[in-house]
């Protein structure tokens, strides 16, 4: 199998010059080295044409609210993949733009407009792709349901985004979603209905067009085999067992929020889902290398809070000042809030797909001429 030359997808590490503080720069470099080693160990190497590394990642509130080192870590992870669906890109796309600067000129992205309304949460969704491996096939659009298929009388809270791509021999339509969340009875019912609606809608398209469709993103599925996952699979999509087994959240409770599901029609594409084809997948836990629990003290200067103290210039009045969190409070805030805001509360979920069908095609020709 041919592997891409490093020169084809090397990141722009000159971005490190943006970090002026010497200690912070040193920490970032050390953590990048650790992260790169972990990526080498856990994610397959990128190939020139044989495979496609497809992923989905909900990057929490993805805008310009992060430290430069965080953009470096996010870009490092993305650079090891070929095509990534990103959820929670905010209206101000400066965070995404910073990451694109680091990824370099061989990367491109396609993003939706902002979904309006309270449930839309001012979010976009986007696809990032390595143009060395993936081609945009000039079709893109947000999914709008027919009037007789509405969800409780309305469209999706956040419009799914469907784009046509090609990698190697594999031509496919890729749809990403960020399904509505909520714990009320009404919200739970709507979540299930949204999942069933998008799966059924795309399955009908796949069958009518005899085309291959993949749907991926944040479905807010609590666990494998529950009614939300069943809504996706009963709608006509298949989730390989090796993908189902990967929880994608951080925390004590195991959740399977993010998924990658397939509805394939080409005789060659179907091999992608062969459970015996050594297809690899995973959920990448970046906290093994960056923003680790033991690193919390390094970030105490940035984890401030507002407290009210007497105003020396105005007797009887108070004023707010910023103070550092310390001790147990700092540890808890770092674990539960700070590193989530800097990276995400989701792990990127990835799968390696075979996209070189040369052997199958040649074998088919041999059988035809042998008749």
Model regions: which residues?
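Active-site-proximal beta-strand elements of phosphoester/diester hydrolases
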Residues: 51-61, 138-142, 171-181
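Active-site beta-strand/loop signature of hydrolases that rely on acidic residues for catalysis
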Residues: 54-59, 77-97, 128, 163, ...
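Acidic/histidine-rich helix-loop elements
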Residues: 51, 59-68, 150, 183-190
């Amino acid at each position: 199998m041919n592997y891409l030359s490093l020169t084809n997808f090397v990141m722009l590490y000159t971005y490190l010059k943006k970090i002026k503080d010497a200690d912070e720069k040193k920490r970032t470099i050390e953590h990048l080295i650790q992260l790169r080693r972990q990526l080498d160990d856990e994610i397959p190497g990128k190939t020139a044409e044989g495979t496609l590394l497809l992923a989905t990642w909900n990057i929490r509130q993805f805008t310009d609210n992060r430290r430069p080192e965080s953009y470096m870590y996010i870009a490092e992870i993305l650079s090891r993949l070929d095509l990534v669906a990103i959820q929670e890109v905010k209206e101000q796309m400066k965070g995404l733009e910073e990451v694109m600067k680091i990824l370099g000129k061989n990367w491109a992205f396609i993003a939706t407009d902002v979904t309006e309304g309270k449930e839309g949460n001012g979010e976009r969704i986007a696809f990032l792709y390595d143009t060395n491996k993936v081609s945009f096939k000039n079709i893109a659009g947000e999914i709008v349901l027919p009037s007789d298929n509405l969800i409780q009388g309305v469209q999706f809270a956040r419009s799914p985004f469907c784009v046509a791509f090609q990698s190697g021999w594999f031509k496919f339509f890729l749809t990403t979603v960020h399904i509505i969340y909520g714990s009320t009875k009404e919200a739970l019912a709507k979540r299930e209905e949204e999942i069933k609606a998008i799966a059924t809608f795309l399955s009908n398209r796949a069958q009518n067009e005899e085309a291959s469709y993949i749907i991926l993103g944040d479905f807010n599925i609590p666990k494998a085999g529950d009614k939300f996952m069943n809504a996706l699979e009963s709608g006509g999509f298949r989730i390989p067992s090796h993908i189902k087994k990967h929880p994608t959240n951080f925390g004590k409770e195991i959740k399977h929020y993010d998924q990658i599901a397939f509805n394939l029609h080409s005789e060659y594409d179907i091999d992608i889902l062969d459970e015996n084809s050594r297809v690899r997948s995973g959920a990448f836990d970046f906290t093994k290398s960056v923003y680790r629990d033991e690193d919390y003290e390094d970030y105490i200067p940035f984890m401030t809070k507002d407290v009210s103290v007497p105003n020396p210039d105005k007797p009887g009045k108070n004023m707010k000042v910023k103070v550092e969190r310390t001790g147990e409070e700092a540890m808890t805030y770092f674990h539960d809030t700070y590193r989530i805001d800097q990276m995400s509360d989701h792990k990127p979920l990835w799968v390696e797909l075979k996209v070189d069908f040369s052997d199958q095609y040649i074998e088919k020709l041999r059988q035809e001429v042998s008749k």
